[in-house]
């Protein structure tokens, strides 16, 4: 399962097929999958995720011409029987101690665990909480004047748990470290202007087969935003535009709306390309 490319498809195949034939090796990532094979005469590798695999790539290069004359790779599983490196162990402990005062600072409280588990419609309680928080931070005039916020599900990396952490803050208290575990990225919030038609396009781009989207990625939404969709409908036509409402009022396809997303999405991340066209960014 770690070498080979059984069932490989999607963006990585399309990307490799567009490369110049002069490219010999593609060391890829971001998919979190493990693969190692030749695609379009190029050696393509990926080492899964979170340090579970190390890829050993072996190239033979003709010194006279600079050309690669042979190439091979092997994905090696990282096992737990390797002794810890004393230098790295000490370095990690040092920076954990430096970060502890910030990581252990209590920033809020909850009365129960809030999970990222999605329902049949693709929404999660934690995703909606994050979208609500993003909306709350940007809806005032001067701070964005947003009417809706969207959050990508892939950016939610853990549940927000009620039980206290080893830091000893106590049950129900949320620390900065716990919130960082939920969203461990350096993203900022971006509020932009979209038309109603662009919001409809954004919702269509959640679904596999619309534009460059190769998987369903249901955006988490702030309170007051509603719409209907059918998975059985054709690609790019799954959302009923007449059903898209903000606080019960249907959107106008030619009207303009202030929309908040994180900077990853604002740059077209996860193939939500219409967000690149947003104007009046703040």
Locations of the language-model features?
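Extracytoplasmic/periplasmic, Sec-exported soluble proteins
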Residues: 7, 26, 51, 83, ...
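N-terminal short leaders/motifs
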Residues: 1-18, 130-131, 135-140, 201
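Active-site-adjacent helix-turn-beta-strand microarchitecture at beta-sheet edges
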Residues: 5-105, 211-221, 234, 238-241, ...
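Feature captures C-terminal
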Residues: 38-42, 67-72, 124, 128-282
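Glycine-rich phosphate/diphosphate-binding loops and the adjacent beta-loop-alpha structural elements
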Residues: 103-123
């Amino acid at each position: 399962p770690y070498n080979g490319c059984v069932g490989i498809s999607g963006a990585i195949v399309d990307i490799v097929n567009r490369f110049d034939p002069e490219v010999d090796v593609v060391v890829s990532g971001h998919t979190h999958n493990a693969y190692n094979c030749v695609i379009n005469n190029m050696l393509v590798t990926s080492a899964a995720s979170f340090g579970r695999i190390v890829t050993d790539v072996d190239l033979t290069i003709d010194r006279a011409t600079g050309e690669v004359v042979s190439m091979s790779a092997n994905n090696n599983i990282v096992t737990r029987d390797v002794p810890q490196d004393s230098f790295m162990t000490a370095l990690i402990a040092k920076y954990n101690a430096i970060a502890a005062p910030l990581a252990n600072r209590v920033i809020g409280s909850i009365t129960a665990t809030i999970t990222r588990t999605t329902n049949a419609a693709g929404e999660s309680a934690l995703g909606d909480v994050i979208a609500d928080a993003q909306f709350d931070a940007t809806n005032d005039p001067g701070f964005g004047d947003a009417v809706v916020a969207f959050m990508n599900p892939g950016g939610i990396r853990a549940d927000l748990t009620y039980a206290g952490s080893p830091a000893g803050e106590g049950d129900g208290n949320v620390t900065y470290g716990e919130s960082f575990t939920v969203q461990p990225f350096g993203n900022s919030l971006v509020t932009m202007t979209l038309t109603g038609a662009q919001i409809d396009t954004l919702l269509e781009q959640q679904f596999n087969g619309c534009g460059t989207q190769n998987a369903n990625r249901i955006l988490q939404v702030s309170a007051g935003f509603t719409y209907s969709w059918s998975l059985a409908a054709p690609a790019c036509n799954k959302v009923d535009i007449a059903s898209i409402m903000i606080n019960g009022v249907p959107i106008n396809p030619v009207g303009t709306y202030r929309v908040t997303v994180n900077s990853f999405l604002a740059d077209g991340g996860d193939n939500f390309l219409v967000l690149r066209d947003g104007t009046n960014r703040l």
